[in-house]
From Swiss-Prot:
UniProt family annotation: Belongs to the dynactin subunit 2 family.
Name of the protein in its database record: Dynactin subunit 2
Organism listed in the record: Rattus norvegicus (Rat)
Region (Disordered): 1-24, 185-205
Quaternary structure note: Subunit of dynactin, a multiprotein complex part of a tripartite complex with dynein and a adapter, such as BICDL1, BICD2 or HOOK3. The dynactin complex is built around ACTR1A/ACTB filament and consists of an actin-related filament composed of a shoulder domain, a pointed end and a barbed end. Its length is defined by its flexible shoulder domain. The soulder is composed of 2 DCTN1 subunits, 4 DCTN2 and 2 DCTN3. The 4 DCNT2 (via N-terminus) bind the ACTR1A filament and act as molecular rulers to determine the length.
An example Gene Ontology biological process: protein localization to centrosome
Coiled-coil zones: 100-130, 215-247
Main location: cytoplasm
Amino acid sequence: MADPKYADLPGIARNEPDVYETSDLPEDDQAEFDAEELSSTSVEHIIVNPNAAYDKFKDKRVGTKGLDFSDRIGKTKRTGYESGDYEMLGEGLGVKETPQQKYQRLLHEVQELTTEVEKIKTTVKESATEEKLTPVVLAKQLAALKQQLVASHLEKLLGPDAAINLADPDGALAKRLLLQLEATKSSKGSSGGKSTGGTPPDSSLVTYELHSRPEQDKFSQAAKVAELEKRLTELEATVRCDQDAQNPLSAGLQGACLMETVELLQAKVNALDLAVLDQVEARLQSVLGKVNEIAKHKASVEDADTQNKVHQLYETIQRWSPVASTLPELVQRLVTIKQLHEQAMQFGQLLTHLDTTQQMMASSLKDNTALLTQVQTTMRENLATVEGNFASIDARMKKLGK
């Protein structure tokens, strides 16, 4: 029954069923919905392998020493992660620098060193207690280093495309020369109809510098020799492979190298000379005659052995004939004896059981005899006691009668 204090409150519907929940889903079930699968071609689905990403960034640490990402206001500038104009490979990555990255790194380091030396020259005064490597000397050495770096002719040879083609300078140089030749041809073709004579100006001249690389030639020659040696080794390995025992041509071809195998083959070819073949044929004829004689002798020996075995088998059959006639009777007797033995075994078992029963009965009789003797003795004693009691009673009765 409802509490009466809520009976007269306004806004309470009377004579209507109570409703405790709405048609909406509960709050926990409202969050469950099926996400739409994006099937648009404009959306790029990127498949990320978490295991590969974990292996790539495993054991990697971000150095936060001396970094400050706070928004505090101060005189000093808050430094975050430093970034440069070029990509620098870290130490211990196991990745070899390309010529482009190496050139950019050296140029960048030389520029940084030049800036630092200029700052030192403007701030530090020369004195007698300076170190051996003074800023002035360091600036001179730095200028020489920069001159050597520029003297590599990389940007001069490859032009503005050095950052792109520095990984293959030879190919880039060839492409650059071809482009300049095409440009020269086109400029000559266009200016040929207008110029009437005289020497061309200096600006139309193209000067090429050819740099010979004997080390590269030696390296390519050594690579060709190594490739030839590799192919020769494979050929030798193929020639001296495992021999086939069934192939008579490959018998004896077990040379350690290609030259020895060729010499063995040459010896086999020389053995096929006509004079040598006649001698071999004569020897083969004599060997063939001996083989025929051995085959005949072997046939006669085999025939004698066969006759001996047949004679022994006939004698065995002759001895077996009388035994075969008596075999059915012998089998019948054996069956009868088997039955008799089974009956005798059963009779023996019965006798054993009877003997055991007789022994049990004898022991029971002995026990009963002993018990009977005890009962008789007890009865005699009891009878004597009863007789004595009756005698005493009679004596008392007689005394009472007097």
